[in-house]
UniProtKB/Swiss-Prot annotation:
Pfam families, per the entry: Ribosomal_L36
Signal peptide residue numbers: none
Superkingdom of the source species: Bacteria
Keyword set, alphabetical order: Ribonucleoprotein, Ribosomal protein
GO cellular component, one term: ribonucleoprotein complex
Protein name: Large ribosomal subunit protein bL36A
Family named by the database record: Belongs to the bacterial ribosomal protein bL36 family.
A GO MF term: structural constituent of ribosome
Residue ranges of coiled coil: none
Source taxonomy: Bacteria, Bacillati, Actinomycetota, Actinomycetes, Kineosporiales
Organism: Kineococcus radiotolerans (strain ATCC BAA-149 / DSM 14245 / SRS30216)
InterPro entries: Ribosomal_bL36 (IPR000473), Ribosomal_bL36_sp (IPR035977), Ribosomal_L36_bact (IPR047621)
GO terms (BP aspect): translation
Length: 40
């Protein structure tokens, strides 16, 4: 999982889901797990 300042480009990938957990924003992608990221 990468830590990114901005998740804007990752949100647009096919199969992406934006999830908020414990105050952090995550992008999860089951189709293509290399796009997994956390903001901050």
């Amino acid at each position: 999982m990468k830590v990114r300042a901005s998740l804007k480009s990752l949100k647009q990938k096919e199969g992406s889901i934006v999830v908020r957990r414990r105050g952090k924003t995550y992008v999860l992608n089951k189709r293509n797990p290399r796009w997994k990221a956390r903001q901050g």
